[in-house]
A protein has these predicted regions:
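P-loop NTPase motor module signature
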Residues: 1-445, 605, 609
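N-terminal intrinsically disordered, low-complexity tails enriched in polar/charged
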Residues: 1-10, 67-68, 478-487, 763-765
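Intrinsic-disorder/low-complexity coil detector
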Residues: 23-24, 34-35, 207, 220, ...
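C-terminal accessory domains/tails appended to large, multi-domain proteins
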Residues: 47-48, 55, 67, 71, ...
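Solvent-exposed, charged interface segments at domain starts and junctions
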Residues: 73, 134, 229-230, 239-241, ...
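Residue-level detector of short coil/turn "hinge" positions at structural boundaries
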Residues: 309, 422-423, 550, 723, ...
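Second RecA-like catalytic domain
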Residues: 316, 364-664
Length: 765
């Protein structure tokens, strides 16, 4: 099957014209325009952070960091050595990028550009001396050798770990770049050592006179937000931030507060919502009292004005690597998270209050920053793809965390099977897949899809999942494609476009945009607007990479679309696969509760692992069901093998072939072998001899040899190895010599198989 699979995918030797729109369009011009000082490459964790940094580079503001450490920062920037800055919220560490860049480049003429999924590289890119990129774009530039040893890398918010960022750190070390890194309050020891920092500047806006009152309360969030607490909020006109671990929890908290106290301004924000919904809170125009519920991840880069009270749920969901799998697990918050969230009011505002909802006895005053938690160990495939793009071994990269060697080898074998990697390097097919701005499975579908399927694949490639696209209470009537979460999600987007959308431009690039009516539509359907906007961004970037015009309208997916899509999936199968709730490795996987797929049959999609109530890993899947006839159509038949099956009542020697489909065995075809064909005679005698040595074969002489075999082995043990050995291999070889000339199972059963002790142990011994 291995050879068959790789051959199938390597047939795609002339894929559609695909261009990586995020790389400099003219590499020679980009290299020639490199300033003598090198460029300053700023690596940001998110697209929003790119915009913040771009604005910050154009500002000249007085900050705590500049007042207390400005001269030291300028001296270090001019020295040519790497260094770090660890600074709390409100100190102005991002604003320090401008003076650092001016010092490094020996000019105040900063020509700043941004490259992320919204803003691709342009012919003007070579003229930029400060380039702000997200982690994924930085990794692509490293793979294309566009970042050089003369460049300085400034990593903003380095504490926001991700597999892409950690890979970029290793790639920058390989190139020999200088690192300047900016972090919130974490233990900087690891980064200082790993990145070879000459020093670490630590700064804080903490004012002891403004230390907050901190209380540990063992209550659930909804119980804590009771009438007594809300009356105090209203009376004192407080600005409250409630930090919770899940989107559903955030929405429930906001709904509960609004229902109990409508006179308190209430809102929520998480990764599924556009930032504009809380713009008044960020600009300081929202009147107190207010309660703003946010996910811990959603709030990390936001500066909420007027905040004087925070409520922190001591719970987080994070991925823990177990046997190469990312298992979503429920844990308590770490010190870094608690300090960062509490630090929004602790030591910053008069009368600040911090409530930590926890079943632990937390001594807040004793909390100290800890080292960051890294993510790279769970993304071996990304490491393998990057190494193949560079033509290097994973051993050549000084990764911040040890690589899971077993998981890495499996990932590399998969990429080789799929024709993406060959001899440690990307194939033509692999380069086409890597050039697309989507995850590898979706990129493979786009490379292999006919033009009429491209709109469907392009849209869904930008949607995390149907589950993450919708709220718990949703109305998808008329949009569901039975058996396909993928196409149902597509239909949700298609309806949003048809009812509320139009084709506009963002940063001069065509993209589907949506008018204000999308909010009402999304509320009625139970859809997250942010997921629609993200899908629009993803679709636009895919179409630009494919060199195709963005369609103004989209057809709805119907039954004929499902058949075409299922055919494409069955032919290429780039996703995880579950058949009858079983995974390839024999594990159990349930269909997700929000899926529109049935429980049985084959489902292609994304497996997600989560910890059950007792901590054991469990798996769920959503995706698209593949009919059995398509599974059979694209299944492969293995070459027949001669095997001895001792469990069969009759005809234990058989020719067996397997019908397999992407790691699943669908059927076995068995043909009894009684007479040995000349081409198989030697192999048949060898297999029967081994079966006899294991005492599995039905042969009258085998039991008669027990005493002799035991005597020979005992003599070998007593002599310390001086007498000949009679282990399994030696016994099988002895039997095989005695089977010379045997050409049928019947002759085997009647053959004389003997073990003569005198041949191994001299009679006198």
């Amino acid at each position: 099957m291995r050879g068959r699979l790789s051959d199938i995918f390597r047939e795609v030797t002339t894929p559609r014209a695909i261009q990586d729109r995020y790389l400099p369009p003219d590499r020679e011009a980009f290299a020639a325009a490199e300033p003598p000082t090198g460029r300053v490459i700023v690596i940001a964790p998110t697209r929003a952070a790119c915009e913040t940094i771009e604005l910050a580079v154009g500002l000249h503001l007085d900050t705590v960091l500049q007042r207390e450490h400005g001269a030291q920062i300028q001296e270090l920037a001019a020295s040519g050595v790497g260094f770090g800055i660890v600074a709390g919220t409100g100190t102005g560490k991002t604003l320090a990028i401008r003076p650092i860049a001016e010092t490094i480049l020996h000019t105040t003429d900063l020509r700043v550009g941004v490259v992320n999924r919204e803003r691709e590289a342009t012919p003007e890119t070579p003229t930029w001396n400060v380039i702000i990129v997200t982690t994924g774009i930085a990794r692509r530039w490293f793979q294309d050798n566009d970042i050089r040893a003369t460049d300085t890398l400034i990593v903003d918010e380095i504490h926001q770990t991700s597999a892409e960022l950690e890979l970029c750190l290793a790639l920058g070390k390989r190139v020999g770049c200088r690192y300047i890194w900016l972090s919130a309050t974490v233990d900087p020891a690891f980064y200082a050592e790993y990145l070879g920092s000459s020093s670490v500047i630590e700064s804080s806006a903490f004012d002891p006179a403004k230390a907050a009152t901190v209380k540990i309360v063992n209550r659930d969030p909804l119980e804590f937000l009771d009438d007594k607490f809300l009356r105090a909020v209203f009376k004192d006109k407080r600005g409250v931030g409630v930090f919770l671990p899940t989107r559903a929890g955030v929405e429930q908290a906001a709904e509960s507060v609004h229902a109990s106290f409508p006179r308190i301004n209430t809102a929520f924000y998480h990764g599924g919502e556009p930032i504009r919904v809380i713009r008044p809170f960020l600009e300081g125009t929202e009147k107190k009292p207010y309660v703003l519920a946010m996910t811990a991840a959603g709030q990390s880069a936001l500066n909420v004005r007027g905040l004087d009270t925070v409520v922190i749920d001591d719970t987080r969901f994070t991925n823990i690597i177990e046997r190469g799998k990312n298992v979503l697990s429920k844990l308590h918050l770490g010190s870094n998270e608690i300090l960062q969230m509490a630090g929004r009011v602790h030591g910053r505002v008069d009368g600040g209050r911090v409530f930590i909802l926890s079943d632990r006895d937390i001594d807040f005053k004793s909390l100290q920053p800890t080292a960051p938690e890294f993510q790279l160990a769970g993304d071996s495939e990304r490491v393998a793809l990057t190494c193949a793009a560079l033509g290097v071994r994973a051993d050549d990269l000084d990764l911040p965390v040890p690589l899971d060697r077993v998981s890495y080898r499996k990932a590399l074998a998969l990429l080789d099977d799929r024709g993406i990697v060959e001899s440690g390097k990307l194939t033509t097919y692999g380069r086409a897949v890597e050039a697309l701005p989507v995850d590898r499975p979706w990129a493979e579908l786009l490379v292999n899809a006919d033009d009429d399927l491209v709109p469907f694949v392009a849209v869904v490639s930008g949607i995390e999942s149907l589950h993450r696209m919708t709220r718990e209470e949703r109305d998808l009537e008329g949009l569901v494609v039975p058996g396909s979460d993928h196409l149902t999600a597509y239909n949700v987007y298609a309806e949003a476009l048809s009812k509320c959308g139009y084709t506009g431009e963002v940063y001069g690039l065509p993209r589907h945009q949506f008018d204000e009516s999308v909010m009402e539509w999304a509320e009625r359907r139970g859809v997250l607007v942010k997921s629609i906007e993200d899908a629009a961004l993803g679709m636009a970037s895919v179409y630009r990479s494919l060199g195709m015009p963005l369609p103004a309208k989209l057809p709805f997916a119907r039954e004929h679309t499902r058949k075409q899509f299922a055919e494409l999936l069955a032919r290429t199968m780039p996703f995880d696969l579950v058949i009858d709730e079983q995974t390839r490795d024999g594990g159990n996987a349930r269909v997700s509760k929000t899926s529109v797929c049935g429980s049985w049959g084959a489902i292609a999609g994304s497996l997600r692992y989560f910890a059950g109530k007792s901590g054991e890993p469990r798996a769920g899947i959503e995706g698209t069901q593949i009919p059995d006839d398509l599974i059979r159509k694209y299944a492969t038949r293995t070459k027949p093998q001669l095997v001895y099956d001792p469990h069969r009542k009759h005809d234990q020697l058989v020719l067996m072939s397997r019908v397999e489909y992407f790691g699943f065995e669908l059927d076995r075809e068995i043909e009894p072998v009684r007479e040995f064909p000349e081409s198989l005679a030697a192999e048949a005698r060898h297999i029967l001899a081994q079966a006899a040595a294991r005492e599995e074969a039905r042969q009258v002489w085998i039991k008669k040899n027990h005493a002799a075999i035991s005597a020979v082995r005992e003599a070998y043990r007593r002599s310390g190895g001086a007498t000949p050995r009679l282990g399994f291999d030696e016994l099988a070889a002895l039997y095989e010599r005695q089977l010379a000339g045997v050409n049928s199972v019947e002759e085997f059963r009647n053959a004389r198989l003997t073990v003569n002790t005198d041949d191994f142990v001299p009679p006198e011994e």
